[in-house]
């Protein structure tokens, strides 16, 4: 506990200093109690050669012992059988009341488990692959700013931005606001092109949270070599900017397959992975699958790049069912209906398509 070899320091006494002090106090005690012969014998036997300066009677050793004995007798287990002072008893009582708990004494609140009740799904950063029940969010692509749509939900749930959480009444845990992951490009321009009609306001039933895909004003992803590249908006998770205009005829693919792209190596990410996920092409499971809101977000590719989406046109959105939300592929585009999450925004594996508003790929 103490440093050794520092005999010149009074703050940190060495073992030799402690022994000298104790011998001095013993000699002093013997003299004060009248045992002078014993005191001289004691000094000669320990071969004391230094000068001794005695303190006032009764001496330090005697005073120290009296204080120790009083406190020793006032301990709770001995105070009934030993005499002690009221000061010693009060000292023990105060020390016992102020002593911290041996288990939780030094643990500040907030360390370990959170204070208060833990909400359901607190330890679930992502939703489970299948979520039975619960509302299914409609797909909203309004021609207005994100702030003007009340009750809009982020396109992708949970786990990416811990600085902000948005709870959902029917989800298992907090839905967290996030920035779009790699593989996501924005949807929906600020003004629709000549052949692109503004889509319906909602695809689901009443009371369902909408996924806003309004125009965004974030930082554009730099791609000076391609005029058709899509700005990558990072201002808000639901704030997506789409291709600048587009005057193609109806039926023009808004998202061409990788074979139709002419700049697949540019610094832009494709909206979806047209090729079904394989062992070397990781899925990005973001939604509940065939029973929940966003099971079709699993096919987003996080590695391949494609900056051209062509002169997009929205054909129609299926209105057969509030839960029928899908994108159909053009002939010749690879498609995997058997694997959930293979197609973007196809959470329910619908086989019925209506001519009203199905987005083409």
Swiss-Prot record:
The chain residues annotated with the modification N6-acetyllysine are 6
List-wise, which residues carry Phosphothreonine?
333
Which spans does this entry mark as compositional bias, Gly residues? 204-219, 289-299
Q: Which InterPro entries match?
A: LisH, SSDP_DNA-bd
Q: Where in the cell is it found?
A: Nucleus
Which segments constitute the LisH domain?
18-50
Query: Could you give one GO CC term from the UniProt record?
Result: nucleus
Q: Name one GO molecular function term.
A: single-stranded DNA binding
Q: Which domain of life is it from?
A: Eukaryota
Q: Where is the composition biased (Polar residues)?
A: 225-236, 317-332, 346-361
Phosphoserine occurs at: 321
Name the UniProt key words of this record, in alphabetical order. Answer: Acetylation, DNA-binding, Nucleus, Phosphoprotein, Transcription, Transcription regulation
Q: Where is this region: Disordered?
A: 147-171, 194-361
Gene from which this protein is expressed: Ssbp2
Q: What is this protein called?
A: Single-stranded DNA-binding protein 2
Chief site of localization: nucleus
Q: Where is the composition biased (Pro residues)?
A: 246-256
């Amino acid at each position: 506990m103490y440093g050794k070899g520092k005999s010149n320091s009074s703050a940190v006494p060495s073992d030799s200093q402690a022994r000298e002090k104790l011998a001095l106090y013993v000699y002093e005690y013997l003299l004060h109690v009248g045992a002078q012969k014993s005191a001289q014998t004691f000094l000669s036997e320990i071969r004391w050669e230094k000068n001794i300066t005695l303190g006032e009677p009764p001496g330090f050793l005697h005073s120290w012992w009296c204080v120790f004995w009083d406190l020793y007798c006032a301990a709770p287990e001995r105070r009934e059988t030993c005499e002690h002072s009221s000061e010693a008893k009060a000292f023990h009582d105060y020390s016992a009341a102020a002593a911290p708990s041996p288990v939780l004494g030094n643990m500040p609140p907030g360390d370990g488990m959170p204070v208060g009740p833990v909400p359901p799904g607190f330890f679930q950063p992502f939703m489970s692959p299948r979520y039975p029940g619960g509302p299914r969010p409609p797909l909203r692509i309004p021609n207005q700013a994100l702030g003007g749509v009340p009750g809009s939900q982020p396109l992708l749930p949970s786990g990416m931005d811990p600085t902000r959480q948005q709870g959902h009444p029917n989800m298992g845990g907090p839905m967290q606001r996030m920035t779009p992951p790699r593989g996501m490009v924005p949807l929906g321009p600020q003004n629709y092109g000549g052949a692109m009609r503004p889509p319906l306001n909602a695809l689901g039933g009443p009371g369902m949270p909408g996924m806003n895909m309004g125009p965004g004003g974030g930082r554009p992803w730099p791609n000076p070599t391609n005029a058709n590249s899509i700005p990558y908006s990072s201002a808000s998770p639901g704030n997506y900017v789409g291709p600048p205009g587009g005057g193609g005829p109806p039926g023009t693919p808004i998202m061409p397959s990788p074979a139709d792209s002419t700049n697949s190596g540019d610094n832009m990410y494709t909206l979806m992975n047209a090729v079904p996920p394989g062992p070397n092409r990781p899925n990005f499971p973001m939604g509940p699958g065939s029973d929940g809101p966003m099971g079709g977000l699993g096919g987003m590719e996080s590695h391949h790049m494609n900056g051209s989406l062509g002169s997009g046109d929205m054909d129609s959105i299926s209105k057969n069912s509030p839960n029928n939300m899908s994108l159909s592929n053009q002939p010749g585009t690879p498609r995997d209906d058997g694997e959930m999450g293979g197609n973007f925004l196809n959470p329910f594996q619908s086989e019925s398509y209506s001519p009203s508003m199905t987005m083409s790929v």
